[in-house]
Design a protein with these regions (language model features):
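Glycine-rich, basic loop-to-helix element that forms the pyrophosphate-binding segment
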Residues: 64-82
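A recurrent flexible, glycine/aromatic-enriched loop bordering the glycosyltransferase active site
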Residues: 128-129, 138-158
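A conserved acidic beta->alpha catalytic loop
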Residues: 44-52, 91
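Conserved donor NDP-sugar-binding/catalytic core segment of glycosyltransferases
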Residues: 95, 99-131
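Catalytic core of nucleotide-sugar-dependent glycosyltransferases
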Residues: 141-145, 201-204, 210-235
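Short aromatic/hydrophobic "clamp" motif used to bind/position activated sugar donors
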Residues: 87
């Protein structure tokens, strides 16, 4: 059953088109299995019967899909009570690790200035088999404005006051809105690492086209440039090409492991 706003400190938004009902149920089950009570908002096409059934079964509120992922997440947060202390979103195939919310809420409670708590993320294939663990640790925030984004989004938790202070997600981004958010939040307060795996990200071999990857990298570079001082922006050419190459290599390696696992 859902927690009431007075009971729940955590709001989690799940955005879905309803095309992967079996994964959506796993996502919702991983949230409901947490020790820390949370309320769930699903943003999806309202006519989708599988989404309606899942919302009823897992006690989630249902809101209409506004047409883009960042807009869906902003809607889920904006249309919810302001009493929640912490907020995040999950895609319809992400999973929270058992104890995830206990770790991240404890980290934010212990660090009142912190805006985000995050941990490591397990990459899994469509069958749930482990491909990779992304574990950058406490130095990930230090390279955020020039290096790769190594803070896994699915298991992180954002302090709601900080989310509202920076205005939520920038809907001009199609892919890099999470990086843009983290860069803004880092200016408000620290991003703290809990030191454990807190989520799983499901890797689909066909989830991003070559064009999507190029757009993602271009958006990431735009977000980073926006976060830098005018002087620092003049030197982005020093690191953008190496980071671009490293990003392509990492994606190819995960893709290779996914194909090997499936084969």
């Amino acid at each position: 059953m859902p927690a009431t706003p007075l009971e729940a400190e955590v709001l989690l938004v799940v955005a879905t088109l309803g095309q992967r009902p079996e994964f959506l149920r796993q996502t919702l089950a991983s949230i409901r299995a947490q020790e820390v009570p949370s309320d769930i908002v699903i943003v999806a096409p309202l006519a989708n019967e599988s989404v309606q059934q899942a919302a009823g079964e897992f006690g989630a509120r249902l809101l209409p899909d506004p047409g883009s992922l960042p807009a869906a997440i902003n809607l889920g947060v904006g249309e919810s009570s302001s009493t929640y202390s912490y907020v995040n979103w999950l895609n319809d195939d992400d999973l929270l690790e058992p104890g995830s919310l206990k770790l991240t809420t404890a980290a934010l409670t212990a660090n009142p200035r912190a805006t985000v708590a995050f941990g490591a993320c397990r990459y899994i294939d469509t069958a749930g088999r482990k491909l990779w663990i992304s574990k950058a640790g406490p130095w990930a925030p230090r390279i955020l404005s020039w290096g790769p984004d190594l803070i896994p989004q699915p298991g992180m938790l954002v302090r709601t006051a900080a989310w509202r202070q920076v205005g939520g997600l920038d809907e001009s981004f199609s892919f890099a809105f999470d990086l843009d958010l983290l860069l803004k939040l880092r200016k408000v307060g620290p991003l703290v690492d809990v030191g454990q795996v807190v989520s799983s990200f499901r890797w689909h071999a066909d989830s991003l086209t070559v064009g999507d990857r190029r757009t993602n990298i271009a958006e990431s570079e735009r977000a980073k440039r926006q976060s830098l001082s005018p002087t620092a922006r003049k030197f982005t050419w020093v690191w953008e090409s190496p980071v671009r190459a490293a990003t392509h290599l990492a994606a190819r390696e995960v893709q290779r492991r996914a194909r090997k696992s499936a084969g």
